[in-house]
A protein has these predicted regions:
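Terminal amphipathic alpha-helical/low-complexity segments used for targeting or macromolecular assembly
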Residues: 1-125, 191, 197-198, 202-216, ...
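Structural signal for interior beta-strand "rungs" in well-ordered beta-sheet cores
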Residues: 58, 121-330
């Protein structure tokens, strides 16, 4: 293992390519059809609002096609379905494809290639217990701390300020960004990326009342992050009381998500920013939980469930359902309730109007009765 802080270019990273591409070249790369000037040259990419004349940009669908009018971009990737609309923009060159965003990102990766991975080796300014085992081609940056009996696989990246507690296991190709903390005995499988300032394996929020005070409940379990998981910055995942808190293969977790003790997250889930899962929540596969959703303890979300933003989930949701609202309910039902709620002011006015009309009718009936009374015969 290397023992220096010298930075040398490694074997990973994108190959060097020309910094300019023509319209024809881009069309060939993405398999699209070019309409306009095939010789137009671009040197960078940007979103449609900020793009300049030398930037490639894209529009994803018909409803956004009008944004082209105020853009300075001269070369724009668009879906095949908007072909008939392009006659209004004859001063631009277009590349027609089936998936504009995918094609745009393909070119972006070429014009803005990832930085080559530096070979730092094992920095002499890192603090590493002698019992730790670190695989080949792994970088441990200055000021990282690695505890007793830690095992780290090959080609990992341990950035500055990372703390890996005693007994942790990291597989191959794990990337821990700066200031991430793994408490003791956490298990991270292969191809996992954890962004800056995450905390994995802290005790859950568990207390019991003893002698009038809140006494902490020890957590003896751990956290297992399965392979091909990405976790956003500032996310926290608590260890289990016993057993494992589990994050399934292929799951993507956004920034600032909180996952409580003993949760079991299925495969290929998407958890968006500021989601909070209480203890022992479980999910199936391909579940999507939108931003700022709260899920109560022991709730299960079935396969393919989608939960809309800012929902509060208090009961299990069967697979394949889309829920939102607080308390969360089926989309169709909650949509009807919201539609009725929006009509409530008009309904209130209508009821008041009917009350006035009814009162007028009552008065009229009373007057008619009084008029119809005949004096008794002499």
């Amino acid at each position: 293992m290397l023992n220096s802080d010298e930075h040398m270019e490694g074997s990973m990273g994108a190959a060097k390519i020309p910094r300019q591409l023509s319209g024809t070249e881009i069309a060939e790369i993405v398999g699209g059809e070019i309409l306009g000037d095939p010789g137009i040259m671009i040197d960078d990419v940007d979103v449609i609002e900020r793009a300049t004349a030398t930037h490639l940009s894209y529009v994803g669908d018909l409803k956004n096609i009008s944004r082209i009018r105020n853009s300075c971009s001269r070369l724009i990737v668009v879906p095949d379905s908007v072909r008939d609309e392009l006659v209004n923009y004859r001063d631009r060159t277009f590349i027609l494809v089936s998936s504009p965003e995918e094609s745009f990102l393909c070119i972006a990766s070429m014009l803005r290639p990832c930085r080559l991975r530096s070979t730092v080796g094992i920095s002499h300014r890192a603090v590493i217990d002698p019992s730790a085992k670190i695989g080949p081609n792994t970088n441990v940056h200055p000021l990282a701390v690695i505890g007793r009996d830690v095992v780290i696989g090959h080609s990992c990246e341990i950035q500055s300020g990372v703390v890996i507690g005693d007994g942790c296991y990291l597989g191959n190709n794990v990337l821990l960004y700066a200031n991430t903390v793994l408490y003791h005995n956490v298990i991270i499988e292969d191809q996992v990326t954890i962004h800056a300032s995450c905390v994995i394996g802290a005790d859950g929020f568990g207390y019991q009342v003893v002698n009038g005070g809140h006494q902490h409940i020890p957590h003896y379990g751990t956290v297992r992050i399965c392979s091909d998981v990405e976790i956003g910055a500032g996310t926290t995942i608590d260890r289990a009381k016993v057993g494992e808190t589990l994050i399934g293969t292929g799951t993507r977790i956004d920034n600032l998500v909180m996952i409580g003790h003993n949760c079991r997250i299925g495969r290929h889930n998407l958890l968006v920013s500021q989601v909070g899962l209480a203890g022992s929540v479980s999910t199936g596969d391909y579940v999507v939980v939108a931003g700022q959703v709260g899920v109560a303890d022991h709730v299960h979300l079935g396969d393919g469930v989608v939960v809309g933003a800012q929902s509060g989930v208090k009961n299990d949701i069967p697979g394949g359902q889309t829920y939102f609202g607080n308390p969360a309910g089926p989309m169709a039902e909650i949509s009807r309730q919201l539609a009725a709620l929006r009509r409530l002011p008009d309904m209130r006015d209508a009821v008041k109007r009917m009350e006035r009309e009814l009162e007028a009718l009552r008065s009229q009936v009373a007057d008619n009765r009084h008029t119809d009374v005949r004096p008794a015969a002499a």
